[in-house]
Design a protein with these regions (language model features):
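N-terminal alpha/beta PP-like core and its mobile active-site loop of ThDP/TPP-dependent enzymes
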Residues: 2-141
Length: 143
């Protein structure tokens, strides 16, 4: 890569967002989530990468929160539980919408029964597409 190309490369996810936006003061909801996680002392999230939650990853990178990407959401939930039990810190599992959230239920239930401090953040389809059969649209609050 040439020096010229390197100098034009974004250094952070915030830089990338700023380039996409006409208003550099705009911040995504995912970045706000990451800032809130950092404020609460979260230093690691367990996840399976998904499109609905990509802005959270960008925010976590900017905030210095470690992202542990696993192969299944149930693994992410169990890992967050194990992390909480071993460290005494809040374990955080981040899943994409629909099946991503439902796949984590067993791990979240295990943590609940064991009184492990974990937080499950689930993605959601766009509100403009809510209840219109969009990809992975599922009401998750009741689950």
């Amino acid at each position: 890569m040439s020096r010229e190309t390197k100098s034009n490369t974004s250094k952070t996810a915030h830089d990338t967002l700023a380039k996409k936006s006409r208003d550099e003061g705009v911040i995504s909801g995912g970045h706000l989530v990451a800032k809130a996680l950092k404020t609460e002392g979260v230093d690691t999230i367990f996840t399976l990468c998904g499109g609905h939650i990509i802005d959270i990853y960008d925010g976590c990178i900017d905030e210095g929160i470690r992202i542990v990407d696993v192969r299944h959401e149930q693994t992410a939930a169990h890992a967050a539980d194990g992390y909480a039990r071993q460290t005494g810190k809040l374990g955080c599992v981040v899943t994409t919408a629909g099946p991503g959230c439902t796949n984590a239920v067993t791990g979240v239930a295990t943590a609940f029964r064991s009184e492990s401090p974990i937080l499950h953040i689930g993605g959601q389809s766009s509100l403009t597409q809510h209840k219109q059969g969009s990809l992975q649209d599922l009401s998750l609050i009741h689950i």
